[in-house]
């Protein structure tokens, strides 16, 4: 435990870099282009420990993570709008994965966008599918922003609370 505490204390001196790391992690984890290759959930749980110093640190980290998550989903939605006719030509997007995402979106609509943030296989594809399906930006952003605020909060909180209670 002392090793973890010393790592956290040394990172506190480079807090802007930690915030940038959190932003990039959540952005890439929420972006259709690279989401499948980035292990973001465990990284956010670990990075939450850096926010244990104070409420201010937690709020900054949560803001940074939320901006990254919201931006990554928005970019994915835009790519779906822009390249909707070419989604089946993407090598990393299998026909089965695309079909599952479309089915989930058709069944659940806007809720599918919200819940896909919390379901790793859908997080990579559902914003893309929702954009390709013609979901209006305003509706998409409603689900995007609410889930983009909640998801990082739920992942950062355990780490922040664990060391503050220790």
Show the residue positions of the predicted features.
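Alpha-helical transmembrane segments of multipass membrane proteins
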Residues: 23, 27, 46, 128-129, ...
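Hydrophobic side chains within alpha-helical segments
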Residues: 32-33, 44, 120, 126, ...
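Central hydrophobic cores of alpha-helical transmembrane segments
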Residues: 40, 144-146
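Hydrophobic alpha-helical segments within and immediately flanking transmembrane helices
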Residues: 42-49
